[in-house]
Amino acid sequence: MSALIEKSLTEIHAMLMTKEVTATEAVKACLEQIAKSEPETKALLHICNDEALKQAEEMDAAGPDASKPLWGVPVVIKDALATNGIPTTAGSKILEGFTPFYDSTAVAKLKEAGAIIVGKANMDEFAMGSTTENSAYQTTTNPWDASRVPGGSSGGSGATVAAGQCYAALGTDTGGSIRLPASFCGCVGVKPTYGRVSRYGMIAYGSSLDQIGPMTRTVEDAARVLNVIGGHDQRDSTSAEQPMEDFVAALEERKDLSGLTIGLPEEYWGEGLSKEVSEACRAAIAKAEELGAKTVPVKLSMTEYAIATYYIIAMAEASSNLSRFDGVRYGHRTEDPKELAELYTKSRTEAFGDEVQRRIIIGTYVLSAGYYDAYYRKAAQIRRLLREDFNKAFESCDIIASPACPTTAFPVGELTSDPLQMYLQDIFTISLNLVGMPGMSLPVAFGKETNMPVGLQFMAPAFDEKTMLQAAHVLEKNLPELPKVKL
């Protein structure tokens, strides 16, 4: 069984189609690995033992269905996405006990494609965090070193893939929450273009920033999942009517990187970047050049304002989105409130964690009448200038490359008392959310000092995931093979 969990999604699906492996065997292999690794990793908030096995047995009885691109493949879903009949908490006590009666669109599409859900992944509360230490339930650890963080907010999704508990996981990315844990956990993480994947059924953090994407072991695996979950959805007003491409087929169109121009922004390769991350990412860029790519310097001069801009906008949107959670219908409710206003106030105060409360307070402040122009309006203006920066940069290159994070995974608890340093972990990822363009993290090496995974980030123009995935796929095939699963 243990050999099965080392397979990629693409490999296990091929084995399922030829009946070399049954869906039940694939699910059992993942559930056994969950039982073995979960006491230390703590990647999952809910495990679907009986439901997954029952579904697998029913699918085996009917036989493989080649029309379903994920038939029989065990997957994990971030707990920010609604799952019919499976608890969904967004990592918060205020949603404790909440079980949706419907599936989010992304989850529904996975099910239609034949995927089997084996668990719900832990996350920072309401996706507010970079380490998964802000979960109200448990702290997820990095499968490569349990003393270190897995990244966040989709840390559970990254850890569950790296620990061999599933073949793919869905994460959400508001400011780097897919790409950061992908970098820290040594897996592939893709943040699609804003609007590429429906947000219907996702518990929102920052509605103009959030996007759902895959976390997998290989680029081809990520392309397969993106093929399934992407596309227009009438139930999401922000869903784009952009035609979907076959990203898996597109991977075979490019055998090398000749004709590809990669932009290297000086703002992402200098101050604050650790030596081991810089060396690993520069070595990967050198390999890309060997494969025919041309590199050119590009300027993203508004980067210095990106952190402040992002947190003003994200916190403002969070303060609005989280106003709906009051403890009345589900989750934590304060005891013996004297009046309705006290029920709301005390329930929210008791159930929201410190980081969530901090962001609600700041968000309310920047939206207040006296400070709206000074903060929120100015941030919106900077956001527009940042988009112009990227558009201009892409006039001279096809994709942009940078480290996904300034460092490798750091020890648990190291930054919890310093919110500003924690926020700086997102410095290379947040700009893409502000401009709505796609990005991904590709594992390229293990750091020489920490021996932890290093991710290289690729960024592309809006709706050009194809070029980004092609470049990552070619580079992945030509870099020294890295271990995909920590057993």
Curated annotation (Swiss-Prot):
Enzyme Commission number: 6.3.5.7
Polar residues compositional bias, start-end: 135-144
One GO process term, biological-process aspect: translation
GO cellular component term, pick one: glutamyl-tRNA(Gln) amidotransferase complex
PROSITE patterns registered for this protein in UniProt: AMIDASES
Swiss-Prot/TrEMBL catalytic activity: L-glutamyl-tRNA(Gln) + L-glutamine + ATP + H2O = L-glutaminyl-tRNA(Gln) + L-glutamate + ADP + phosphate + H(+)
Domain of life: Bacteria
Annotated SUPFAM superfamilies: Amidase signature (AS) enzymes
Catalytic residue positions: K78 (charge relay system), S153 (charge relay system), S177 (acyl-ester intermediate)
Assembly information from the UniProt record: Heterotrimer of A, B and C subunits.
Function: Allows the formation of correctly charged Gln-tRNA(Gln) through the transamidation of misacylated Glu-tRNA(Gln) in organisms which lack glutaminyl-tRNA synthetase. The reaction takes place in the presence of glutamine and ATP through an activated gamma-phospho-Glu-tRNA(Gln).
Protein's UniProt name: Glutamyl-tRNA(Gln) amidotransferase subunit A
Species of provenance: Maridesulfovibrio salexigens (strain ATCC 14822 / DSM 2638 / NCIMB 8403 / VKM B-1763)
Lineage, highest ranks first: Bacteria, Pseudomonadati, Thermodesulfobacteriota, Desulfovibrionia, Desulfovibrionales
